[in-house]
A protein has these predicted regions:
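Amphipathic alpha-helical scaffolding segments comprising HEAT/armadillo-like alpha-solenoid repeats
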Residues: 1-2, 20-34, 53-65, 84-101, ...
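Cyclic-nucleotide recognition modules
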Residues: 352-390
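Eukaryotic acidic, Ser/Thr-rich intrinsically disordered low-complexity regions
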Residues: 247-285
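A small-molecule sensor/coupling module
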Residues: 281-293, 307-310, 372-373, 380, ...
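Alpha-helical adaptor scaffolds
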Residues: 191-225, 229
Length: 390
């Protein structure tokens, strides 16, 4: 029942009534028997956080891998909970050094990948995805590093360190320098200390070993729909030579990619277009186009494109004629809108209280608090709005 979100907490409480060694053994068996059940694996990792046994640390470490960020985030969080609740000492820094090294190397590789990309519109989503993955890797690294001193100030500063806006960073850096070994600091500092950058020679070596084309090819063949779609979209717009190097048998058909390939010129390429034909209704904007539009809105600009694409898939663009009402004061607030084109007048009674144009959002408060609309919204001219349902 651990994988059933409705039963998870209750199941954990019941398991606490049994001998912890038996529980740990059975959970480990489940991990082995149901390797492909990702939801179960996540919940077992969360469940194991309630046991401070050395065996649990070993089990979780095995699932802390660079090729599965989602599981690794949960593993790092569970390990920190264990470290905070342990009374016995454990050599966390030495035991997890190789793990930290693997994650910092992956972070560095992504850093080099980003450097190799040109600064233009066709690389926007790839850079956005790299930034997203780098932030998540850094989160895992800082959580695992903190295991050595679990009640240190590092944990409470992780979010700000990742966002590069921690006012206390000088004190955090000083704390790290006095608390960790030189080999750990050598891995950590280039990621968080603005004055301690990666050496240019090291970057150039990495770029030689993993050139841009190999990254784009690997991402195109990824089983992650978003990464695959944005990489193939990049190839079509910027570098068609990569297209013929892609192993299309590895590329998974998905709605985003189907739209990317829908009107592409297949001449001189090896793209098996029939594999990616998706019988969906025609839309005014593709998922990628809607995601780009959402990224221009203040409300969504800090959300990674991969997550925003999920919002794009449940949104619809709609035309409104000049003078047409979008919603009235008192209507049920079951959706929000983004202005894509035109102008929208927000009125209360006979008074205009706001005039919204491209990029503005409206109706979001009613969506969040389930209250009725508190004003009227009327198209001031012919407009196109993106409607996002609850």
């Amino acid at each position: 029942n651990l994988e059933n979100i409705k039963c998870t907490l209750k199941t954990r409480k019941i398991l606490k009534l049994y001998n912890y060694k038996i529980v740990i053994r059975h959970l480990e068996e489940q991990l082995s028997l149901k390797k492909d059940n990702k939801n179960l694996k996540k919940e077992i990792m969360r469940c194991l956080a309630g046991y401070a046994d050395d065996r649990v640390i070993q089990i979780i470490k095995r699932h802390l891998k660079v090729n599965n960020i989602n599981i690794s985030i949960i593993c790092s969080e569970s390990l920190l909970k264990i470290a905070k609740n342990r009374s016995k000492t454990f050599s966390f820094e030495d035991y997890f050094f190789d793990t930290i090294k693997n994650f910092t190397h992956q972070y560095f590789k992504l850093h080099c990948f980003r450097i190799s990309l040109a600064d233009n519109k066709s690389t926007f989503f790839i850079k956005d995805q790299i930034d997203y993955e780098m932030r998540r890797y850094l989160y895992i690294i800082l959580k695992v590093v903190t295991l050595k001193i679990p009640n240190s100030p590092i944990d409470s500063h992780i979010k700000n360190i990742i966002e590069n806006n921690d006012k206390d960073l000088p004190y955090i850096l000083e704390f790290l320098e006095t608390s960790f070994s030189k080999k750990t600091l050598n891995l950590l500092m280039p990621m968080i200390d603005p004055e301690n950058n990666y050496k240019n020679e090291k970057i150039q070596n990495q770029l030689s070993n993993n050139p841009l084309n190999s990254w784009i090819k690997n991402w195109s063949e990824s089983d992650k729909n978003w990464k695959s779609a944005i990489s193939i979209d990049y190839c079509l717009k910027h570098d068609k030579e990569i297209i013929n190097n892609i192993d299309w048998s590895k590329v998974v058909s998905n709605p985003i990619l189907s739209q990317v390939l829908e009107n592409c010129d297949n001449k001189g390429t090896s793209i098996p277009l029939e594999k990616f034909q998706n019988k969906t209704e025609k839309t005014m904007f593709t998922i990628l186009e809607k995601t780009i539009l959402l990224k221009t809105v203040d409300l969504f600009q800090d959300i990674p494109g991969e997550l925003l694409s999920q919002v794009s898939q449940i949104s619809k663009a709609k035309n409104y004629d000049n003078g047409e009402t979008i919603f009235r004061d008192g209507d049920v607030g079951d959706s929000m809108f983004i202005v894509l084109e035109g102008k929208i007048s927000i009125t209360k009674g006979d008074k205009e209280i706001a005039l919204l144009d491209k990029g503005a959002s409206l109706g979001e408060m009613a969506l969040l608090d389930n209250e009725n609309r508190s004003a009227n919204a009327i198209a001031k001219e012919d407009s196109i709005l993106l409607k996002i349902n609850q």
